[in-house]
C-alpha cells in the first residue's frame, strides 16, 4: 500500500476526485493511531495530548482512495468558540462530501463507551446517508466487562453488523478494517 499525505485543510477540501474513508471520534480515541495501523506506516501524526488534530487531514491511498483524519470532538479543555468552529467545519465537511464518502469509521473507546457526541455523529451519518462502521478502540486497555458493556451500547444503534473491535497497539482489527476500506 502506498500512502501519501496531501495536507491539512481548514476551509477548502481537495477536489472530490476519489472516494473517501473518514475516521471520526472523540479526542484521543485513537483515530490517527488506527489510520497508521491500517496502512502500516506512521503517516498521521499521533499525540497523547487530546485535541492535537485541528484540521481535516487528507491522505491518498494507492492513488484511488482518500483516507481522512478529522479533529476529535468532546475535548473539555477546548473553549466553546473552538468547539463551535469544529462543529461547523465537520457539518460543512459531511454536507459537502456526503456523496463522496464511501465509509465513515466512528471510533469509540472501549473503556469510555458511547458518549452523547457519539450519538450525535450517528445521527449525522443517518441524516446525510453516510454508511458507517463503529470501531471499538483500545481493547488492549479494557477489561472484558468494559468491552462487553460498550458492545451492548453500540448494538443499540447498529445491531450486530457494522462493528469492529480493534487495538492499534496490537494490530487487532486491521484485516476487517482493510476489507471495509478496499471493498
Swiss-Prot record:
Keywords: Cell cycle, Cell division, GTP-binding, Magnesium, Metal-binding, Nucleotide-binding, Septation. GTP binds at residues 25-32, 51-55, 69-72, 137-140, 166-168. Residues 17-183 form the EngB-type G domain. CDD domains: YihA_EngB. The gene is engB. Its cofactor is Mg(2+). HAMAP family: GTPase_EngB (MF_00321). One of its GO terms (molecular function) is metal ion binding. This is Probable GTP-binding protein EngB. It holds the Pfam family MMR_HSR1. One of its GO terms (biological process) is division septum assembly. Necessary for normal cell division and for the maintenance of normal septation.
Amino acid at each position: 500500500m502506498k500512502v501519501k499525505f496531501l495536507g491539512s485543510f481548514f476551509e477548502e477540501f481537495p477536489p472530490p476526485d476519489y472516494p473517501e474513508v473518514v475516521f471520526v471520534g472523540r479526542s484521543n480515541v485513537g483515530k490517527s493511531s488506527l489510520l497508521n495501523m491500517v496502512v502500516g506506516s506512521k503517516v498521521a501524526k499521533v499525540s497523547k495530548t487530546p485535541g492535537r488534530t485541528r484540521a481535516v487531514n487528507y491522505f491518498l491511498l494507492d492513488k484511488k482512495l482518500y483516507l481522512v483524519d478529522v479533529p476529535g470532538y468532546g475535548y473539555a479543555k477546548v473553549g466553546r468558540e473552538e468547539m463551535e468552529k469544529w462543529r461547523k467545519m465537520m457539518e460543512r465537511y459531511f454536507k459537502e462530501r456526503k456523496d463522496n464518502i464511501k465509509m465513515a469509521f466512528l471510533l469509540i473507546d472501549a473503556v469510555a463507551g458511547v458518549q452523547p457526541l457519539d450519538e450525535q455523529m450517528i445521527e449525522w451519518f443517518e441524516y446525510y446517508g453516510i454508511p458507517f462502521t463503529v470501531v471499538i478502540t483500545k481493547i488492549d486497555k479494557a477489561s472484558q466487562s468494559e468491552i462487553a458493556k460498550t458492545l451492548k451500547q453500540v448494538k443499540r444503534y447498529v445491531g450486530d453488523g457494522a462493528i469492529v473491535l480493534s487495538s492499534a497497539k496490537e494490530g487487532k482489527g486491521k484485516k476487517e478494517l482493510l476489507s471495509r476500506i478496499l471493498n
